[in-house]
Structure formats: C-alpha cells, structure tokens
Amino acid sequence: KKPGALRGKAAKTFATKVKSEMAFLNMPNVELVPYFEKCEPNSNGTDKMELLISANPGETPRPVAKIASGGELSRMMLAIKTVLASTDTVDTLIFDEVDTGISGSAAEKVGLKLREVSKSSQVLCVTHQAQIAALADYHYLIRKQVEKGRTFTNVTLLDHNGRAGELARIIG
C-alpha cells in the first residue's frame, strides 16, 4: 500500500479511538473526521492531516481551533493523550483547568481518565473540581497573594487532613 493510504487508515482508526474516549468524557455526540490535504513533499510525506470536529449533532465538522470551547479542547487533548499513552514518550502532561465548563459527573470521568493516563506519564492538573482533585495521588494547594503591591504564588503539598479540608472547601 502507498504511505498515503496507510496514513488514511491509521487516521480513521485513531479518530475512532479518540471518539470512544470522548464519549466516556461525556461528549457522546462528537464526530471526528481526519482531513488530508496535499502539501510539498517533506520528511513527513506529501500530505498533511487536520482533525475536524463536530461537537454537536447536525453540525458540519470543522477545524478544532475554530469551534471547540476550552473545556472541549481540554477533554479532546485528554482523549488523545489516553489513546497515545502506550506509545507517547512525553514524561509530563500538564492540564490547566481541564474541568472548565463541565458537570460533576463529567468531572469524575475526567478524573478517572487523568488517573489512567498517570500510569504512563506524570500528570499535573490544575482543577477547581473536587471530583478530580479527590482522585489525585498528591494534592497541592496553590494560592496567590498580594504583598506590597506584588503578586506571589504559594504552593503547598497537603497532608491527609489538609486535603480533606480543601476538598470540603471546594465542594462548598
């Protein structure tokens, strides 16, 4: 087979796996379509691929950057990293507010997926959801404070009691 045909097949398989992960993350209606465009021959081949997304039924798939919200982008990245976890060589993944715009049940699923990914990579996650924080191996409290007109960030590793108190504070 030609490299382009092999890429197309691999891209469809990849999109199917990512779609399955996104369904788990409370995005059951997402459609992912690999789109190939010819380009000047280079070390990566003669075409480039862009993943098009439709987050809601009836929408035409479009480039991710043009339609996905912050929460959708975060969950999509988490889904992609989950699919690639066994072959990816990234040592540390950072998710900053991966919980943006999601409900409690979706947050729990995101937390479970983060825990799964953490088996093959170190995961750092900034979250405001107790469902995610409760599933972490370690819990750091990050506080910003202003002193003498300057902002400082303080990061503290919480012990068991501190963690319980912080989870209670997050819940309200």
Show the residue positions of the predicted features.
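GG-anchored amphipathic helix commonly corresponding to the ABC/SMC/Rad50 NBD signature/C-loop
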Residues: 51, 55-57, 71-93, 117
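Walker B catalytic acidic pair
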Residues: 96-97
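C-terminal lobe/lid and adjacent interdomain/linker elements of RecA-like ASCE P-loop ATPase modules
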Residues: 105-172
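Conserved D-loop-proximal element of ABC-family nucleotide-binding domains
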Residues: 87-88, 100-108
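Charged, surface-exposed helical/loop "interaction arms" that form contiguous linear patches used
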Residues: 1-40
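Short pre-catalytic strand/loop immediately N-terminal to key active-site residues, enriched for Gly-Thr
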Residues: 61-68
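Flexible glycine-/small-residue-rich
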Residues: 34-38, 53-57, 80-82, 144, ...
